[in-house]
Amino acid sequence: VALLFLVFALLIASPSASPTNEGTPVYFTVRPGMSVSSIGKELHERGVIDSEMKFWWTAKLNGLENKVKTGTFAMQTGMTPRDALEKLVYGNTVTIRFVIPEGFGVKEIAERLEKEGLVRADDFMERAKTFRPYPYIEQHENVRYAAEGFLFPDTYELSDSFDADSIMTMMAENFDHRLTKEMRDRAKEMHLSIYELVTLASLVEKEAYHDEDRPIIAQIFLKRLRLGMPLQADPTVQYLLDEPKEDLLYSDTEVASPYNTYQNVGLPPGPIASPGTASLMAVLHPAHTNYLYFVADRNGKNYYATNYADHLALVDQVR
């Protein structure tokens, strides 16, 4: 046994090969309940250390297995197992500034959180499937993520040791706070549920490149809903794709899904992204026009038409 410990002591003391990305900043989060072995595994996977075994034995031989703190730490690739361990035991945790742009969906938010080293994307997306902290987040069949649309786009100061649930809760509470009494009352006047408001606003968010377009697009969608016309919103089809396309094919618009607003009349089952205040307000206060169609050029400029013939001419013009 003594010989075995000597071998591992020599192994730990031996110099580590430095990864090719040595010195790249890494935010690493130790979550409650993580074991030293799981911490070492993640550190190794992210290039912070070159050996999870050395990390484990360093903790074991120094009696530090249960001394690692929870929280987020500023680390870097190419650290020795000893330096990494000392950082997690004696170092200070950090607060990360995290930005969600308008129009981000659950998947994009999850991927950005994982990139920052805060939570695993899969854990976040799994929790988002059933996350309904407020009664206005309705439960519908075929909805991908219950939380979709209700994680308000904003800048967040994420304190250390936040998990997927606490991050999601903070974002949903922010949405609930931003949804003022006046906005709720206005939605009621329009005979829109909060869920319908957010769903429609998410389409506006994904379609509008410029603020001045939001009320016009909102008005077109509301009018189409009243007339029983399909919304034919490209972003609802993009939402179904693993990777967005610059240009949808006709075959894409034929995919069988309740989210496909080319094939189905009415709103999709739920929101497709997180709308900002401007898109929510556009739905609540739409423009007054006779437009029924619109198309955007490569620069995001929208062109509007009142009839299908004019719309087709605009499509030929901009594409």
Name what the model sees in each region.
Residues V1-G23:
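N-terminal type II signal-anchor transmembrane helix
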Residues S37-K87:
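Extracytoplasmic/periplasmic/luminal assembly and interaction segments
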Residues G23-T24, L64-F73, T93, G149-F152, ...:
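Surface-exposed aromatic
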